[in-house]
Amino acid sequence: MEEKGLTVSAYDLREMLEKKEPVVVLDVRPKEQREEWQIPGSIYVDAYKRLNANDPAVLDEIELPTSGKVVTVCAAGKTSKIAANELRKRGIEAYSLEGGMKGWSLAWNTAWKQFDGFSVCQVRRTGKGCLSYILSSEKEAIIIDASLPVDVYAQLIKQHQLSVKYVIDTHIHADHLSRSKELAEYFHAPLYLPSNNKVQFVFNPITADTVFTIGSFVLEPIPTPGHTFESTSFLGNDEILLTGDTLFVDGVGRPDLKANSEEALNKSKLLYQSLQTLLSLPGEVIVLPAHTGKAVDFDEKLIQASLGKVMKSVPMLSLSEEDFINTLLKRIPATPENYLSIVDKNLKGDFSDINPVELEAGANRCAVS
């Protein structure tokens, strides 16, 4: 483990959690920050104000193991250093998470599942809830909705001896920077985006006739406007359904980003019709969304559900069009931080003048349930 004094990097903590090493993650942030997002498996103590008021006795109120490591975490890595130092005075091997939750935002893990003739690797950005996919068959691969640095996907592709044939985005994302353009350039693979968008770089447009084939696996686009006008879902071998931000396992996409009230209403109508299209598919089809609203455990289990199960667990999907639209617009969550800047960067495809961690900071707020 690479240490800098009292600190441990997000990379090292990710490795510890992935390898199931004995480590306790202690969250000392204000409660409202904890409720927005957290590190999976972490424990919480409401210590932020007292630690900053030079009252470390608050740490005596929790039971921590006397062996193994404890990693303290706050928003940016300052208060957690106070906590780690105090715990060391108590004989505990404690470290502060370098960069705090901002630094953790790029942490990731994976879940693999083998289907008949193809595999799905769900690459989960656990620090933010973004889900991307490596679909593979006969050593060829498609990468969809890349949200992490290129080296993450390069590592996984090399590890499984795959050749990238296509790189795809389901829509123009508003809560994270798309790494798909950079990824396509790295692998010398064609970049495909839905045709109805305003990006300012060269790409291959996805049309109703576009079909992606790798080995014995066939991926077909289904236009599903609503979350954005260009949003597209993808049906793979009639078994899996990649829904982007149109449909989640516990909710539906929001229609209001970059939209005034009239545009949000029109997009809500489009979203309803798109969902009806998806709900007409067989109930056993597996839904694979582009986001989740919860911190992703290091459990190697796909975040997925059958379409039939999603229909039963998301009450909004049973509403009439009018009731659906009214309910949707009443439940819109707070907008993602910096989403206008993120959309602008994704349209330009150039992130050279920004710090991605700073721009992407904040909770995932894509779903309405």
Regions found by a protein language model. Give the residues of each.
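Active-site environment of divalent metal-dependent phosphoester hydrolases
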Residues: K31-E32, A76-T79, V150-D151, I172-S178, ...
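Catalytic cysteine-centered active loop of the rhodanese-like fold, especially the PTP/DSP P-loop
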Residues: V45, P56-K102
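Active-site neighborhood of phospho(di)ester-bond hydrolases with catalytic His/Asp-centered motifs
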Residues: C74, I143-A146, S163-H173, Y192-N196, ...
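Conserved beta-strand hairpin/beta-sheet module of binuclear metal-dependent hydrolase folds
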Residues: P30, W112-H160, F234-T243, D250
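Accessory terminal helices/loops
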Residues: M1-T7, N85-R90, T110-A111, Q273-I286, ...
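Active-site HxH/HxHxD metal-binding segment of metal-dependent hydrolases
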Residues: N85, G129, A141, P149-I222
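Positively charged, proline/Ser/Thr-rich regional signature most characteristic
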Residues: E2-V70, L148, L359
